[in-house]
């Protein structure tokens, strides 16, 4: 059995990243860990976020013998990566908002970043804008409600389009031609976002870039024999771990439809979060 790729998020948003990784690495085993007991992360204090995430991920890495960790959460990536890399001995990949490609793609030089309040307010985000989009007018939009709406869509199959239109009204009024989806939950709402914003706004996320980075790192750390063995691997292991006491039937169905054969609640021992 190969060492799995561990994808981590606060909720179901990381499934959008997982899907991109599986396109490039279809024969690999995967673990999906989501800390839905503390969702949404954009509302947490930094130290609480760091201690909780590191304890939880470290516990699952030790249990699953993961080969690599993908922190498929923009909010966590902006604060947790240094502590996580100091704790783990395996590669850790984070999510970077697609500011650079957005600036390159924009014709009007008016772009937006839609993310959680935590991502929007952090210095790291402003550094990205200064470094890669200094020739653009950049509007920042923070919303935790959209995270919960994405979770609700997966759990129930329903979405309040009237409320979504209200939430997105400042973006419509901003007259942008490119919008960066700076939260991995938001690609789950891509069709609905496009419907409200119109075809004149291009939506960008980081899923494909993350997948390419994961493939590169695995190639650097594995021998040719290991790669060939995994390519021939047919009985894929797909495990999902969550932290909330219960998950909805709709979410469980979604995970099973994604190929997960094991769904298990996990609790942290050393976390103060």
Curated annotation (Swiss-Prot):
Reaction equations catalysed: L-glutamate = D-glutamate
Broadest EC class assigned to this enzyme: isomerase
Keyword Magnesium tagged: no
GO terms classed as biological process: cell wall organization; peptidoglycan biosynthetic process; regulation of cell shape
Molecular function, one GO term: glutamate racemase activity
Disulfide bonds: none
Pathway: Cell wall biogenesis; peptidoglycan biosynthesis
Keyword terms of this UniProt record: Cell shape, Cell wall biogenesis/degradation, Isomerase, Peptidoglycan synthesis
Binding, substrate: 9-10, 41-42, 74-75, 184-185
Matches recorded under InterPro entries: Asp/Glu/hydantoin_racemase (IPR015942), Asp/Glu_race (IPR001920), Asp/Glu_racemase_AS_1 (IPR018187), Asp/Glu_racemase_AS_2 (IPR033134), Glu_race (IPR004391)
EC code: 5.1.1.3
Active-site residues (renumbered): 73 (proton donor/acceptor), 183 (proton donor/acceptor)
UniProt similarity note: Belongs to the aspartate/glutamate racemases family.
Main function: Provides the (R)-glutamate required for cell wall biosynthesis.
Database matches in HAMAP family: Glu_racemase
Descriptive protein name: Glutamate racemase
Gene name of the record: murI
């Amino acid at each position: 059995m190969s060492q799995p790729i561990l994808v981590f998020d606060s909720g179901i948003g990381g499934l959008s990243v997982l899907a991109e990784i599986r396109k490039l690495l279809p024969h690999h085993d995967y673990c999906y860990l989501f800390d839905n007991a503390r969702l949404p992360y954009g509302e947490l204090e930094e130290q609480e976020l760091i201690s909780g995430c590191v304890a939880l991920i470290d516990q699952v890495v030790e249990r699953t013998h993961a080969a690599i960790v993908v922190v498929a959460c923009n909010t966590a990536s902006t604060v947790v990566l240094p502590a996580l890399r100091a704790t783990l001995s395996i590669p850790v990949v984070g999510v970077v908002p697609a500011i650079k490609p957005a600036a390159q793609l924009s014709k009007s030089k008016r772009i937006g970043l839609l993310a959680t309040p935590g991502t929007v307010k952090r210095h790291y985000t402003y550094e990205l804008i200064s470094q890669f989009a200094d020739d653009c007018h950049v509007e920042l939009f923070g919303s935790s409600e959209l995270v919960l709406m994405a979770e609700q869509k997966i759990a129930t199959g329903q979405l309040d389009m009237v409320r979504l239109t209200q939430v997105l009204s400042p973006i419509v009024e901003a007259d942008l031609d490119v919008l960066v989806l700076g939260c991995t939950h938001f690609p789950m709402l891509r069709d609905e976002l496009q419907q409200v914003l119109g075809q004149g706004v291009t939506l960008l996320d980081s899923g494909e870039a993350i997948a390419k980075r994961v493939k590169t790192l695995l190639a650097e750390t594995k021998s040719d024999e290991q790669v060939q063995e995994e390519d021939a691997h047919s009985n894929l292991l797909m495990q999902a771990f969550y932290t909330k006491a219960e998950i909805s039937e709709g979410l469980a169905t979604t995970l099973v439809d994604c190929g997960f054969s094991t769904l298990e609640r996990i609790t942290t021992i050393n976390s103060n979060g």
